[in-house]
């Protein structure tokens, strides 16, 4: 399926503007004609933050921004799907064009700016799937013009508490001015304190404790990673997602579109994000869940993330270039890897290569 898509489907979709092509793919999933379900392998099941995932492969936030197709994504074989980023009020994001393909590099640069229809539109859609099986997380953000950005994150926790299986606090998008400043220790302390307080208050009212993950940038210094790890431990955060898109342009094969402002995702992000993942694993120790994101486009890259320290992995850009058959292809490859490695579950392969990845040097 992936090979056929690369030959025919991608050629057709790539005749459209990147944002139009994205809209067409959402429409295709809504029709239900795109399904590539892969038989479940119990050896791929992973328990993370109190949730049992049927497999470790998830759809990253940014694709289904408005919670339109989470169940269709699960039918592609994903073990979980993350919708958003959602802000309290609708916002249009940055002016178009704002998505740029770097085809030779199997990469994308975007400067979307949290364009979404807001909490209420997504709430209505997610309410319609209440009671359905499948893990759907909600990625929450802040409106660009918010006077109190932390209050926007708190609002997201409260609005979606009954519907989200987990939350991701996104403070690492490079496309909202000043947002990444929330990763600094003092600001992060206030953010996590208020968000987790809201989570605990909501949880106490319904006896459900929803995990909260923090999504960080791949462009952080070792000292900044130290601060985030320390704060995550002190606040008893449920996990960290490593990582969002990068501002770095190192290693690109083709300069076309590389000077565009925005975050770079796809294959060139793999090395940087995996190194930062491993370094974060060394800092937080074996118990805190980590979700690896960035450059996953095969079973080999997914397995490398797990061996570098990830409990779960997510992809997005790989799907653009490889098509809807990619999740199944990755899961089959991971099942084969488990047998080849002589272990009984994918979780046993975590951290096999953490030290080697953490020691690699990064080019800015």
Swiss-Prot record:
Cofactor binding, note field: Binds 1 FMN per subunit.
Membrane disposition: Peripheral membrane protein
One GO location term (cellular component): plasma membrane
Species of provenance: Brucella canis (strain ATCC 23365 / NCTC 10854 / RM-666)
Positions of the catalytic residues: 173 (nucleophile)
Protein name listed in UniProt: Dihydroorotate dehydrogenase (quinone)
CDD domains per the UniProt record, alphabetical: DHOD_2_like
Subunit structure: Monomer.
Pathway this chain belongs to: Pyrimidine metabolism; UMP biosynthesis via de novo pathway; orotate from (S)-dihydroorotate (quinone route): step 1/1
């Amino acid at each position: 399926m992936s090979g056929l898509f690369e030959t025919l489907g991608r050629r057709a979709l790539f005749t459209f503007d990147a944002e139009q092509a994205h809209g067409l793919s959402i429409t295709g999933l809504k029709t239900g004609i795109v399904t590539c379900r892969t038989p479940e392998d119990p050896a791929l099941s992973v328990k993370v933050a109190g949730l049992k995932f049927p497999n470790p492969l998830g759809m990253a936030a940014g694709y289904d921004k408005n919670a339109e197709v989470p169940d269709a994504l699960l039918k592609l074989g994903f073990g979980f799907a993350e919708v958003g980023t959602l802000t309290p009020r609708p916002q249009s994001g940055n002016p178009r064009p704002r998505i740029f393909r770097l085809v030779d590099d199997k990469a994308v640069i975007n400067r979307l700016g949290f364009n979404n229809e807001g909490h209420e539109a997504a709430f209505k859609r997610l309410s319609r799937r209440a009671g359905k099986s499948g893990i759907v997380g909600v990625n929450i953000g802040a409106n660009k013009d918010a006077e109190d950005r932390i209050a926007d994150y708190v609002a997201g926790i409260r609005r979606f508490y009954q519907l989200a299986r987990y939350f991701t606090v996104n403070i690492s998008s490079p496309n909202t001015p000043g947002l990444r400043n929330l990763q600094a220790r003092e600001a992060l302390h206030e953010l996590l304190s208020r968000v987790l307080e809201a989570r605990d208050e909501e949880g106490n009212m319904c006896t459900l404790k929803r995990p909260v993950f923090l999504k960080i940038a791949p462009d952080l210094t070792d000292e900044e990673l130290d601060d985030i790890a320390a704060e995550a431990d002190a606040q008893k955060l449920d996990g960290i997602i490593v990582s969002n898109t990068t501002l770095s342009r190192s290693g690109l094969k083709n300069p076309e579109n590389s000077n565009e402002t925005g975050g770079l995702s796809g294959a060139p992000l793999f090395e940087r994000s995996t190194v930062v993942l491993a370094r974060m694993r060394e800092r937080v120790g074996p118990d805190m869940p980590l979700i690896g994101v960035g450059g996953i486009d095969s079973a080999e890259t997914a397995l490398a993330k797990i061996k570098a320290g990830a409990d779960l992995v997510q992809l997005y850009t790989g799907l653009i270039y490889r098509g809807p058959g990619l999740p199944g292809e990755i899961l089959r490859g991971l099942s084969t890897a488990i047998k080849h490695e002589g272990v009984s579950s994918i979780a046993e392969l975590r951290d096999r290569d953490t030290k080697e990845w953490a020691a690699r040097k990064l080019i800015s």
